[in-house]
A protein has these predicted regions:
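Conserved SAM-binding loop of SAM-dependent methyltransferases across substrates and taxa
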Residues: 271-283
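Class I SAM-dependent methyltransferase SAM-binding "motif I" and its flanking Rossmann-like core
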Residues: 87-151, 320-321, 365-366, 410-434, ...
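Class I S-adenosyl-L-methionine
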Residues: 1-114, 118-119, 141, 148, ...
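A contiguous loop/helix-start segment that scaffolds small-molecule binding in enzyme catalytic cores
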Residues: 2-17, 30-33, 80-82, 150-242, ...
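S-adenosyl-L-methionine
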Residues: 293-350, 354-361
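Conserved class I S-adenosyl-L-methionine
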Residues: 261-270
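Helix-to-beta-strand junctions that scaffold the AdoMet/dcAdoMet cofactor pocket
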Residues: 386-387
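Active-site capping/gating segments
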Residues: 196-210, 401-403, 408-452, 470-471
């Protein structure tokens, strides 16, 4: 019987990543010090490189561009002992994750220190399972908006000294002005300190760029709290009427079935509501909104920022032409949470949900076709773009678009359904039902291997059957 292996063997020429805290060399473990002392090449930021003794070692700052530069750097120094210095725990929103994804677990050894996240939780007395981490390092501060909820505890990893004031301003704008903020600076170092206050009226001056903002979310009276469950109210979005309505949007997203790290194309995005709610489901989710109207495209960007997913990519153009080449372009990753600003990271070796990236070249996992269904070649272009296991959902409200979906259903199978919603409304002095426009929905999944329906088999009317008229 084989014995369990508690330590994976690492090749002698492996890249070693050493985590270092604000206390510098003095805070390193014996193992970490020995690793750094034995290095031929040290790679890291200027601050970290300055924390360790010079010795007989080559010190190199982060290359630019980051990812491509790292590959060149390690190739140049192949056969030498290369040590990378990183903040705290390199696998908590750090460069260790990037290196593992680039080179694999057998080529990278990690020697962690205590992360700023762990120190912040310890200072605040917050259990890990009862708080959420959001990084705005080199990112749009509006990413915090997705995580806001009454009673939520947030640890915001700051980009610089101005981040606390930006977070306070965002909290006030989103109706969380009563939230308490604690700015934890230089955690683990000699200059560690904490500033506290309330978001509304936050007037603390910017100080150390090395800070974590702890937020205890409190919703202001009368303010709206937005759920992460798909189906936000229509008035949560700025729109001109071109929006997939709330009830139908919730059902549409159930069919699109977002999973962590997956990519959606929202074709004919209108207000961007489907793409935005897709990204809100999980912080690693990505989306591209394709919209021909520049004014609507600008509106999508505003909606995405206001609803906490500013990394939504908006493409101004008409489909299907605008879809050409999209699978080979950069899509920002809403979950990238590096403690050092850097370009994105690739999909882990061996598959699995991606942990972060801005330079992926993958096909969409799902496509929502909300406009232009009747345009020749549109449905086929969307189907051709789908990756393995991909899902497509298309909506139609006109006879021409419905005919296109009926044809697609006859050709490819899947599911074809009609949805109608009626709402109670005043009818004179009484109340009656007001119907919304009936919507036809075609959904298709590559994973289902659905066969096209048989036409006119005698059991039920098929597409094009003369007996399919309403009765």
């Amino acid at each position: 019987m084989s014995q369990p292996a508690f330590r994976t063997p690492v090749p002698a020429d492996a890249i070693t990543v050493v985590g270092i805290g604000a206390d510098g060399w003095a805070g390193l473990s014996e193992d970490a010090r020995a690793t750094v002392a034995a290095a031929d090449v040290l790679v890291g930021g200027e601050r970290h490189l300055g924390m360790v003794p010079d010795g007989n070692v080559t010190k190199l700052s982060w290359p630019k561009p980051f990812r491509a530069g790292l590959s060149d750097l390690f190739a140049e120094h192949r056969g030498r002992r290369v040590v990378v210095l990183a903040s705290g725990d390199p696998l908590v929103s750090g460069v260790g994750t990037t290196l593992l994804e680039m080179f694999g677990r057998n080529a990278v050894r990690v020697v962690p220190a205590v992360s700023s996240v762990a120190l912040a939780r310890a200072r605040m007395g917050w259990p890990a399972e009862r708080s959420e981490v959001v990084s705005v390092v080199g990112r749009n501060v509006h990413r915090v908006g997705r995580a806001l909820a009454p009673g939520q505890r947030l640890l915001v990893l700051s980009s610089d000294a101005s981040t606390p004031s930006e977070v306070a301003r965002l909290l006030v704008e989103r109706g969380y002005g009563a939230s308490r903020m604690s700015v934890l600076e230089d955690l683990g170092g000699d200059d560690e300190r904490c500033m506290q206050g309330v978001a509304e009226g936050w007037a603390q001056p910017p100080t150390s760029p090395l800070n974590v903002v702890a937020v205890e979310c409190e919703l202001d009276p009368g303010a709206a709290a937005w759920s992460l469950v798909p189906g936000l109210p229509d008035d949560a979005f700025e729109h001109d009427g071109q929006i997939t309505k709330r009830d139908l949007r919730a059902g549409c997203l159930a069919r699109l079935a977002p999973l962590p790290g997956q990519l959606l194309w929202d074709v004919g995005a209108g207000s961007g509501s489907v793409a935005i709610e897709w990204m809100r489901v999980h912080p690693a989710n990505r989306a591209v909104a394709i919209e021909a109207d520049p004014e609507r495209a600008a509106r999508i960007r505003r909606n995405a920022e206001r609803l906490g997913v500013p990394d939504l990519r908006v493409v101004v153009g008409s489909a299907p032409e605008a879809l050409s080449g999209l699978a080979g372009t950069q899509v920002p990753d809403s979950a990238a949470t590096d403690s050092h600003p850097m370009p994105g990271r690739g999909r882990p070796a061996g598959g699995g949900p991606p942990a972060g990236s801005g330079d992926r070249h993958d096909a969409p996992d799902a496509v929502f076709l909300g406009g232009g269904v009747s345009v020749p070649g549109m449905v086929d272009a969307c189907l051709d773009a789908l990756g393995p296991g991909g899902r497509l959902v298309a909506h139609a409200v006109t006879l021409q678009a419905e005919a296109a979906l009926t044809s697609a259903y006859a050709t490819y199978g899947g599911e074809l359904a009609r949805h109608s919603v009626e709402r109670a409304a005043p009818l004179g002095s009484l109340t009656g039902w007001t119907p919304a426009r009936t919507l036809t929905q075609w959904s298709f999944s590559r994973a289902s291997h659905a066969e096209p329906p048989e036409v006119g088999d005698g059991s039920a009317p098929g597409p094009g059957d003369p007996n399919d008229s309403p009765r």
